[in-house]
Amino acid sequence: MIARLHRVWWGLRQESSWGWRELATGRLRWQIDVIAYRAMAFPSVARYYKKHELDRFRVLKTKGGVTLYYRTNRGDIQGIREIFIDEIYRLPEHVKVTGLVDLGANIGLATVWLATTYGLTGVIAVEPLPENARLLRTNVRANNIACQVIEAAVGTTTGVTYFAETSESNLGHVADAGREIPLVDVREIVNELSFPRPLLKMDIEGMEGELLQSIDPVWTRKFVAMVMEMHPEIVNVGELVQIIRDQGFEYRESYEITKGYQRAKRERLFVRQEI
């Protein structure tokens, strides 16, 4: 019991989201959800949330005018913290983008943050799970973002595939068995881009290896920058980094920022060398 209480306390001290000053409405509800998220170390709390709260929608509004719809599962709460508070997708000032292709958009948190932060005029978001895609559409509509939502998994061919799901919303992945979902070839998406200076954001739970190694990675040259999460337990990160470098990108490795108890991480960034 003492060990669990210590983990909850330590987690809250690390939780930069606890004191999110940019919230205009929904702060108390958000703080309760953050406490519950950390308190799920206790089985009774986890059971209650799974039974009563897991799929309920919450609404937050920031002082900057952004509206976010989320659920009380781990993936949504953690995603808000990482993307809106820790700003893991913030780009260097010299990198100028006007559009976005978001592979693995989930409920649209990164889509919304990138589009509103950088004033993007062209946005494509790809998400395979219907329940996530519905909330993705809700979030982009709520923030007046012109976004084409593609409800499919991304791969190296077009057809159907299987998707293994989890209760945490952001950890599902393409698998040999599971829910049958549409599959779209990444090259079809890229070849139809109509906006200039696009950014690629990719978080597809290990499928990045297939997109970069199973087909010619020349498709990446369409982008002025790419920010992505790589999964070293699934892919060889060094090999993927070299593949992208060979396409003319400069690599900036992910790194961690520590401020007191708070820790934040920037994702791996690739910038075209001519920028």
What are these regions (language model features)?
Residues 1-275:
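Phosphate/nucleotide-binding beta-alpha loop and adjacent structural elements of enzyme active sites
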